[in-house]
Swiss-Prot record:
<comment type="similarity">
    <text>Belongs to the phosphatidylserine decarboxylase family. PSD-B subfamily. Prokaryotic type I sub-subfamily.</text>
</comment>
<feature type="active site" description="Charge relay system; for autoendoproteolytic cleavage activity">
    <location>
        <position position="147"/>
    </location>
</feature>
<feature type="active site" description="Schiff-base intermediate with substrate; via pyruvic acid; for decarboxylase activity">
    <location>
        <position position="254"/>
    </location>
</feature>
<dbReference type="InterPro" id="IPR033177">
    <property type="entry name" value="PSD-B"/>
</dbReference>
<dbReference type="InterPro" id="IPR033178">
    <property type="entry name" value="PSD_type1_pro"/>
</dbReference>
<feature type="region of interest" description="Disordered">
    <location>
        <begin position="290"/>
        <end position="320"/>
    </location>
</feature>
<keyword id="KW-0472">Membrane</keyword>
<keyword id="KW-1208">Phospholipid metabolism</keyword>
<feature type="site" description="Cleavage (non-hydrolytic); by autocatalysis">
    <location>
        <begin position="253"/>
        <end position="254"/>
    </location>
</feature>
<comment type="pathway">
    <text>Phospholipid metabolism; phosphatidylethanolamine biosynthesis; phosphatidylethanolamine from CDP-diacylglycerol: step 2/2.</text>
</comment>
<feature type="compositionally biased region" description="Basic and acidic residues">
    <location>
        <begin position="301"/>
        <end position="320"/>
    </location>
</feature>
<keyword id="KW-0670">Pyruvate</keyword>
<keyword id="KW-0594">Phospholipid biosynthesis</keyword>
<comment type="subunit">
    <text>Heterodimer of a large membrane-associated beta subunit and a small pyruvoyl-containing alpha subunit.</text>
</comment>
<keyword id="KW-1003">Cell membrane</keyword>
<dbReference type="GO" id="GO:0005886">
    <property type="term" value="C:plasma membrane"/>
</dbReference>
<protein>
    <recommendedName>
        <fullName>Phosphatidylserine decarboxylase proenzyme</fullName>
        <ecNumber>4.1.1.65</ecNumber>
    </recommendedName>
</protein>
Length: 320
């Protein structure tokens, strides 16, 4: 009964207005009140401020400044093996695995369409049919900048308007085509591992999605698909990003989906749904790589804290 009510609210509540209100409040300078809200947030979600370049919460003029806080350079070591693609974000793996022709796993027993995720762009979808994917959820406690898994040349960016459903265990199980319905920004790159898409997905209360090359992509929310393209390789006007480099950020959280072409990369064997991710740790390896790559083990306390903060974890599950 409670789950039915929560699910009904996802359809009834004015999600766009709630998101606008949250974005407005998070951008306001309110002095001691801003610091109080940040302090309560840090305590509730067990945010590790020792990792931040500015660990003192008084240093942040707005909640947004705190939310997109940069980390110290030494806290996310980058795996520099050229055959290894690294995790793009701190968070938790929602799902990962093979793309079965046009089907991507959303939750156990629930698929959604690759072509729908890519806003009906069948030519782009053809690049990734029978390839692989990884979906990473960023919880409120996480660092909310998104980085490159490998070196890449930006070729295309598409803004897709959509719903703003919350992303959690309940919606993943009950909202069909959740990620293909929500607002999102699709970024297509040429890489040495073939084409790669990195998709930033919005949700309720996600105030904005930004990229390093264009700034704020949304808002404004104009209700139309927008598309930008860039030249390849060393051509004038091309945009190259390096492995581990920041490519975008969320002001309030959400989800990153990576798509990889068939026959190019192999996802790390030990990763599974609810695996905790840290930027710079191995996500996948080139198919011809001879040595396996594994993420560094995390303290159990960190894993428990991440699972407690993640709505992807079913309340009935053992979070320890």
């Amino acid at each position: 009964m409670l789950n039915d009510l929560k699910l009904s609210l996802q359809y009834i509540l004015p999600k766009l207005w709630l998101t606008r209100l949250a974005g407005w409040g998070a951008s306001k300078r309110a002095g001691w009140l801003t610091k109080l809200v940040i302090d309560l947030f840090v305590k509730y979600y067990k945010v590790d401020m020792k990792e931040a370049q500015k660990p003192d919460t008084a240093a942040y003029r707005t909640f947004n400044d705190f939310f997109v806080r940069p980390l110290r350079d030494d806290v996310r070591p980058l795996n520099t093996d050229p055959n290894v693609l690294v995790m793009p974000a701190d968070g938790v793996i929602s799902q990962l695995g093979a793309i079965e022709n046009d089907k991507i796993l959303q939750a156990k027993g629930h698929d959604y369409s690759l072509e729908a995720l890519l806003a009906g762009n069948y030519q782009m979808a053809d690049l990734f049919r029978n390839g692989s994917f990884a979906t990473t959820y960023l919880s409120p406690r996480d660092y909310h900048r998104v980085h490159m898994p490998c070196n890449g040349i930006l070729r295309e960016m598409i803004y897709v308007p959509g719903d703003l459903f919350s992303v959690n265990h309940l919606t993943a199980q009950n909202v069909p085509n959740l990620f293909a319905r929500n607002e999102r920004v699709i970024c297509l790159f040429d890489t040495e591992f073939g084409p790669m898409a990195q998709i930033l997905v919005g949700a309720t209360i996600v105030g904005s999605i930004e990229t390093v090359w264009s700034g704020t992509v949304t808002p404004p929310r104009e209700g139309i698909i927008k598309r930008w393209t860039w030249p390849a390789g060393d051509n004038e006007g091309s945009i190259a990003l390096l492995k581990g480099q920041e490519m975008g950020r969320f002001k309030l959280g959400s989800t990153v989906i990576n798509l990889f072409a068939p026959g190019q990369v192999k996802l790390v064997d030990t990763l599974q749904s609810l695996s905790v991710t840290k930027i710079g740790q191995p996500l996948a390896t080139a198919v011809e790589a001879t040595a396996a790559a594994e993420p560094a083990p995390l303290p159990e306390e960190e894993i428990r804290a991440e699972h407690r903060a993640s709505p992807l974890v079913d309340d009935k599950q053992d979070q320890g």
